[in-house]
């Protein structure tokens, strides 16, 4: 695949997630809402497929995956990692509060399905697999195939950021316009800042650490609701 064609991969995760949830619900003979709580398991599967696709695309261009995202050992200070991690947390939370207020008139709104309990052993495995696979898949795609490949500065930031946020509309997939808008607005401020930071620094490591941290927090909540009886109902009632 030619380097100038790599940006055409940007919509792939949104499409695959939509198809994955719809097809799995159809095969199981259940409603989309009923399969939503398995989103973390399905996300890991899509992440692995994404990583394999990125490795293949990189090799077609005579690169490694690490070269695709410009990952270099030893070039990052811990202060930068700490700063970006804090930035991810603050902007990520602010985006969710703003989206909750705009879409549900409730700044503290959070879709219950995101932390819904699943089988304990899957939840425990996912606390490792989800953060790691998501970081490599998403940052590899939107930074490596997006920001790194698009020549125009503003397009290099805004186009990958758009698709970076859009994919979350389908994780999990619910055919509800307000929910889709909420998910998009929740992540758009953060994805713009991450793409801007990467465009300026060309260093993915701080972004990847911060990204993994927020996904680890989500996975930890799923472990908690899956292992502590009554916790999910209590959290939904807050």
Task: Identify the residue ranges that each predicted region occupies.
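Transmembrane helix-loop-helix hairpins at the membrane interface
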Residues: 120-238
């Amino acid at each position: 695949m030619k380097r100038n064609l790599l940006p055409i991969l940007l919509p792939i995760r949104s499409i695959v997630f939509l198809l994955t949830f719809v097809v799995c619900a159809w095969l199981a003979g259940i409603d989309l809402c009923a399969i939503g709580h398995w989103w973390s398991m399905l996300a890991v599967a899509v992440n692995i497929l994404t990583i394999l696709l990125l490795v293949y695309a990189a090799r077609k261009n005579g690169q490694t995956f690490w070269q695709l995202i410009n990952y270099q050992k030893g070039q990052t200070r811990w202060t930068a990692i700490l700063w970006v991690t804090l930035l991810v947390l603050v902007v990520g939370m602010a985006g969710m509060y703003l989206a909750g207020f705009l879409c549900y008139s409730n700044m503290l709104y959070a879709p219950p399905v995101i932390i819904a309990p699943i089988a304990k052993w899957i939840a425990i495995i996912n606390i490792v697999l989800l953060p790691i696979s998501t970081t490599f898949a998403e940052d590899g795609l939107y930074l490596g195939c997006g920001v790194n490949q698009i020549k125009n500065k503003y397009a290099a930031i805004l186009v990958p950021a758009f698709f970076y946020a859009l994919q979350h509309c389908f994780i999990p997939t619910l055919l509800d316009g307000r929910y889709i808008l909420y998910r998009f607005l929740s992540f758009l401020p953060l994805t713009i800042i991450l793409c801007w930071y990467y465009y300026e620094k060309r260093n993915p490591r701080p972004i990847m650490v911060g990204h993994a941290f927020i996904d680890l927090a989500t996975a930890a909540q799923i472990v908690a609701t899956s292992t502590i009886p009554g916790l999910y109902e209590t959290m939904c009632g807050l």
